[in-house]
Amino acid sequence: MDSALAYNKNSLMEGSIMSQTRPNSDPVEIDASDPLRLHDVDHVRFYCGNAKQAAYFYAWNFGFQVEQYRDLTTGSRDTASYLLRQGNIRLILETGLTTDHEAAQEVATYGDGVKDVSLNVDDAEAAYEQAIRNGAESGYEPIEETDEHGTVVRAAIRSYGRVLHTFVSRKGDYGLDAVRAGGRFGPGWEKVGHFPLNEYNQQNPCGLEFVDHLVGNVELGKMNHWVEWYAEVLGFKLFKHFDEADISTEYTSLMSKVMDSGFGVIKMPINEPADGRRKSQIEEYLDWHNGTPGVQHLALRTDDELHSVHELRRRGVNFLKVPQSYYDEVWERVKALGWDVKEDHEKIADLGILVDADDEGYLLQLFTQPLQDRPTLFFEIISRRGSQSFGKGNFKALFEAIEREQARRGNL
């Protein structure tokens, strides 16, 4: 479990076993008989207080296309849901239509946030049964939905907190390739007619391509439990480990272990707080998430960080701020590792983008402010130029920026 994978410097995704769903990845021999072989993140489902209003927020601020819906008019009596897509990122925004529905109750308890990270597999029922044999707790048993267009099978297991991993398998017109291209999502989903922002977003793209990684926050002392869970239940491998010496400031610190699916599909860092003089960002998250673990942020990959951040800022997205003094030394730090940042240095500084490097290349990254009033879920916008790391050289500047925001909120 503690062995690291071998990594390809020229690939966009980590792992010696590469996914064919990612740009520039190299096809390799993989075990097609493994029921837990993951093809892709099928979608990420959010519970929202008002899914229709949230759809406008994500469409305008982040450039998502609002493509399909399911509500009372389509026969959904319990929930209203909207499917948003950008590149190979698919978000479902879902709200409960009755006060006793789980979605409504969880929003009241935890606020808007990620409920489900769904994983595409060949056979959802077989994947579910294997995961249960590996020690997972059931979220719900296999459900098959079929109509004249095809079949979708879903089955879920429980991860940390209230988070589910739903296995999804697709056939017919609901196949993964069709879904990636914006085709039919599943039985009961209808195409959105005129949505005023869709044409605008096509003409003014934000350039977000796919989910690079997805980070969870858990309680003190629970990180290793969930690292072992992902290894034993889903066959993930430990990719990187950061301790309080790596991720600390004068006041706070945390620990993190990064788990990789082994097929280049998804990486899932898991954070826990460490001892510090003040309340860490993980503790703040847990406080405002009713003491319950959950998804802290989604990192969304772009091939053009400067364009994406510029467009997102133009649309009103608020990002964490680092002082201009950060740029006094970052270029030499990256150059000392053997890399010249090709993007315009002045524009990077003007946009407040963070830069880091390792022995495989460099990366550009920036983090949004929380996406809702509670200081919980946020997005990261990341571009990789060979680097397979997570911005270790930026940890101090980043967490000092987070601490400044915590202090403004009265939570440090």
Go through the PLM ranges and name each one:
Residues 2-6:
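Acidic, Ala/Val/Gly-enriched low-complexity intrinsically disordered segments
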Residues 7-17:
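Short, Lys/Arg-enriched N-terminal segments with co-localized hydrophobic residues
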Residues 17, 36-39, 45-90, 133, ...:
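Core segments of cupin and vicinal oxygen chelate
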Residues 17-52, 114-117, 179-227, 291-301, ...:
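N-terminal beta-strand motif that seeds the catalytic metal site of vicinal oxygen chelate
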Residues 22-23, 35, 39, 48, ...:
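C-terminal functional regions that serve as terminal interaction/effector modules
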Residues 41-48, 64, 84, 91-93, ...:
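Short, structured motif recognition centered on aromatic/hydrophobic residues
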Residues 68-80, 92, 97-116, 121, ...:
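A cross-kingdom feature marking solvent-exposed beta-strand/loop segments within repeated
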Residues 112-117, 133, 139-250, 255-257, ...:
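Extended catalytic-interface subdomain
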